[in-house]
Amino acid sequence: MPRQAASRLVVGEGEGPPGASGPAATMLRSLLLHSLRLCAQTASCLVLFPRFLGTAFMLWLLDFLCIRKHFLRRRHPDHPEPEVELNSEGEEMPPDDPPICVSDDNRLCTLASLKAVWHGQKLDFFKQAHEGGPAPNSEVVRPDGFQSQRILDYAQGTRPLVLNFGSCTUPPFMARMSAFQRLVTKYQRDVDFLIIYIEEAHPSDGWVTTDSPYVIPQHRSLEDRVSAARVLQQGAPGCALVLDTMANSSSSAYGAYFERLYVIQSGTIMYQGGRGPDGYQVSELRTWLERYDEQLHGTRPHRF
């Protein structure tokens, strides 16, 4: 009897209370997951750092006015002179992509600018959206009533959905808004358009530029973002306008900072524009829409 009791005692001590290994296993899995994320972040930084250094060096060079005037005011030899477009009254209209102008009193290589550049490059590297792949159905917010929706809620059947990401303090975005409005007017019969207001490109308490048409600080709340979006809405084209969430979920999913253009059709990304400011080309969007219109109606569209 004593031997049996001792045997039962040893077995009981070895088993331990049920579920004792559960918290330890969960903690181990969590630690492993965080370690993998840290390794991924470190690897991405190593990949991005040379690109970031190149951009930083270019910004430093552009702070020399003689270099800035030479590079920003010359026309690339591969880009021919744009066609002159006339409106119904025979008046010449501005080009789709007016040249990027930077005033002489603006410094480009600052701590705030480098932070913004790094933020944009990191979002672009980790974005989920890629041309030919599925369109991320990220969350957006309506400016009236703060109702939460999804980007693909604005897609209707097989009609293309054009996404235009940007903010009021982004000079290229605002300078090309009239060209975007012309595309909305021309193609809205067959195509849907959605403007997504994201975090400010040049907030008054961040990377400041005198070329920005508005003085708007960083958004501290959704109410701040709504107020900024209403400024854009007053002069925005006749298409839907929504806000990115304060977690910047749509900007992150689409790598949209500073500004960017996309076309979605049947849940697939058919066109992915370059990241602004250099890659933000309304003329590329026009070309895509002209080709789509030609395929849809079988006639070559006429520019107006």
From Swiss-Prot:
Q: Which organism is it from?
A: Mus musculus
List the GO terms this entry assigns under cellular component, sorted alphabetically: endosome membrane; plasma membrane
Q: Which domain of life is it from?
A: Eukaryota
Which InterPro entries does the UniProt entry name for this protein? Iodothyronine_deiodinase (IPR000643), Iodothyronine_deiodinase_AS (IPR008261), Iodothyronine_deiodinase_I/III (IPR027252), Thioredoxin-like_sf (IPR036249)
**What is the phylogenetic placement of the source species in the record?**
Eukaryota, Metazoa, Chordata, Craniata, Vertebrata
A single Gene Ontology biological process assigned to it is: apoptotic process
Q: What is this protein called in UniProt? A: Thyroxine 5-deiodinase
Checking Pfam families in the record gives: T4_deiodinase
What coarse category fits the chief subcellular location reported for this protein? membrane
Q: Where is the active site?
A: U170
